[in-house]
């Protein structure tokens, strides 16, 4: 799962599929 990280201005990957 990937999500955008506005604090670091890039996309991040996570195992947590429940993350928005």
Swiss-Prot record:
Coiled coil: none annotated. The N-terminus is blocked. Residues 1-20 form the Barwin domain. InterPro entries: Barwin_dom. It comes from the Eukaryota. GO terms for biological process: defense response to bacterium; defense response to fungus. This is Punein. It comes from Punica granatum (Pomegranate).
């Amino acid at each position: 799962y990937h999500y955008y990280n506005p604090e670091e201005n890039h996309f991040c990957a996570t195992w947590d599929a429940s993350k928005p």
